[in-house]
Amino acid sequence: MEMLRRSSVFAAEVMEVFDRSPTDKELVSQSKVLCRDYIHSRLHRAGIGWSKPEHGSGGTLAEVSSVLLWLGDELEYLRPNVYRNVARQLNITIASENIVSDAFLAVAAEIFSTEYSRKGLEKHKGVTWGKIVSLYAVAGALAVDCVRNGHPAMVHTIVDCMGEFVRKSLASWLKKRGGWADITKCVVSTDPSFHSHWLVTAACACGHYLKAVVFYLLREK
């Protein structure tokens, strides 16, 4: 009986972990792991040798990482030239950590600046999964630029910036959706309208990114 009681207690504790909402700290930490995975994938695709992250994603987060990469591929396929040569588009010197972080955070803020509303959902400050994938695509492309030009240390700067932006601007939105695992609905849903909505938000994300680049360049003049 004692063993059964302990098993029940353990099972309850495990279920509590899965049922509870993720904390801001957990969401930020997971966002950085996902960013490392995304950057590693893009560096590998570009033919740049790069060691796999020591603390890579596992379990549910590994599935999220796979979906994020798949959606990133789809987004980049829609607009193949948008997420390349990001440093050149922004006209920044990637040798400076401050410039790289400032540019990334400025573009991120502009991507998510547009108000967004959809029937049945609350109005939120421009957050969609399409825009989040767009931000990761920017991070991956910028990291490739940095490493290619001899500044691999900037990868850590970009990852830290991603975590900072998630903490300040995306954590509450993610928490309302139960965490990062919600992104898997973009590919597992059998509702054609859901996938159609994803393609629309992804296409819009490209537009918001291009607008962000223009605003950043105008700000620098």
Curated annotation (Swiss-Prot):
SMART domains for this protein: BCL
Name this protein carries in UniProt: Bcl-2-related ovarian killer protein homolog A
Motif (BH2): 173-187
Tissue: Strongest expression in ovary and eye, weaker expression in gut, kidney and brain. Little expression in liver or heart.
UniProt motif (BH1) ranges: 110-140
Gene that this polypeptide is encoded by: boka
Family matches, as PANTHER family: BCL-2 RELATED, BCL-2-RELATED OVARIAN KILLER PROTEIN
Membrane topology type: Single-pass membrane protein
Motif BH4: where in chain: 32-44
